[in-house]
Regions:
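Residue-level signature of mid-helix packing/kink "hotspots" within the transmembrane helices
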Residues: 34, 63-71, 121, 155-156
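Cytoplasmic helix-loop-helix junction between adjacent transmembrane helices
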Residues: 112-152
Length: 230
């Protein structure tokens, strides 16, 4: 039994690779989130937006849908295939980022940004749930810290994109590039297997224990209570 526990506590190279891949997706997530803000000096005059309109796009329109849908996505992540949920969200926000790059005015930019918030809200709850099942408890703080580094890295890279890629591609080209990259990564995510849920395995073990106990001791109140609880 002891060797089996130690075996379960071991972290393999593919687990680290999976963590780094999800962290990279988090980097892309935050680059995408910041891109419209850091390109304000180009977007506002070209689309003839007022400060109020641009404030709506970067503030309430995005944040409301991101915050509200984040709650629902956390619930959904507990019930569906999480790798596919991430792939769906990543594909959605990446496609809408491409549409944002083709915007001609307020509405054609506001509508994609609204649903980009929906797509981006899938990543954090599903990724943290996956990592929680993939790594042992003693690694949880480290794992979440690595995943969270994607926020700072993404913020920093968004500024570098403005400095070095905008003169070459323009703001629209940067949107197209990031969106296209995200679509490719979404397809890669679809190829990954779902990580078995740890709590389901523990529930199955408890069910097995209660069943064996019932066979040994007879059909007792304890067995009924355990079965009802599960």
């Amino acid at each position: 039994m002891e060797s089996r526990v130690n075996e379960n506590e071991q972290v393999q190279a593919r687990d680290i690779a999976f963590l780094l891949f999800l962290t990279f997706l988090n980097v892309i997530n935050y680059i995408d989130r910041q891109l419209i803000g850091v390109f304000a000096n180009w977007i506002v005059p070209e689309l003839d937006l007022s400060n109020f309109e641009f404030g709506l796009i970067t503030g309430p329109i995005f944040i409301f849908f991101y915050a509200v849908m984040g709650l629902f996505m956390g619930i959904i992540a507990d019930r569906v295939n999480r790798t596919r949920l991430i792939a769906f969200g990543l594909g959605l926000w990446s496609f809408l980022t491409v549409l944002s790059g083709a915007a001609k005015g307020f509405l054609s930019l506001a509508l994609p940004r609204m649903f980009i918030g929906v797509g981006e809200s899938t990543l954090a709850p599903a990724a943290i749930s996956l990592l929680g099942d993939r790594f042992p408890a003693k690694w949880q703080g480290f794992v979440v810290g690595i995943f969270g580094m994607g926020v700072s890295i993404g913020l920093g890279l968004s500024l570098l994109i403005v400095a070095y890629l905008e003169p070459i591609l323009g703001w629209r080209g940067c949107f197209y590039l990031l969106g296209g990259m995200g679509i490719v990564l979404a397809l890669c995510m679809l190829l990954m297997r779902e990580t078995p849920r740890r709590h389901l395995g523990e529930m199955q073990k408890e069910n097995d224990i209660s069943t064996n106990k019932g066979l040994l001791d007879g059909f007792s109140f304890r067995t009924v209570a355990l079965d009802l609880r599960n």
